[in-house]
């Protein structure tokens, strides 16, 4: 039977996530499958992959053909490298201990690079949030200055109006008093 390792779409419109399945190549994309070996969520950063490593390796060894995207996923998870190393052991290029040592070194390096990417992304997010906060503080400061200036203008206008009314009221009171004195 011609088997494929393929993605089976789930989720909703605009927010797809996938099951990684072993299926007959003649079956429809989201139809019947032989075995589910993992899931893939491209909506997270970095994309989340939950994979049964041993079963994926088994199916690759018995001849299941991965699709392009699943080949990239399996390669990123190290399944393709492990298969390659095990084929080298079968051919006698090196022993199984050396193959396992190479795989563990690759895995450690891969995990370190993924961790560095996550740290870089989180640092960039923190820097962006800090920059937004500073910009907001500057904008609030500018708004506060404008409001204070308007309040000062209103207070000055009110004081001028009060002084004008007081000046108008004082001569009016004095004028009748001087007329009556004559």
Curated annotation (Swiss-Prot):
**Keyword Ribosomal protein carried by entry:** yes
Molecular function terms in GO for this entry? structural constituent of ribosome
Say which domain of life the source belongs to.
Answer: Bacteria
SUPFAM superfamilies assigned = Ribosomal protein S16
Gene3D superfamilies, per this entry? 3.30.1320.10
> Which cellular component terms (GO) are annotated to the entry?
cytoplasm; small ribosomal subunit
**Where in this protein does the record put region Disordered?**
158-182
The GO biological-process annotations, alphabetized, read as: translation
The protein's matches in InterPro entries, at most eight in alphabetical order, are given as: Ribosomal_bS16, Ribosomal_bS16_dom_sf
| Record keywords, A-Z | Ribonucleoprotein, Ribosomal protein
Similarity comment: Belongs to the bacterial ribosomal protein bS16 family.
Protein name, as recorded:
Small ribosomal subunit protein bS16
The organism named in the record is: Parabacteroides distasonis (strain ATCC 8503 / DSM 20701 / CIP 104284 / JCM 5825 / NCTC 11152)
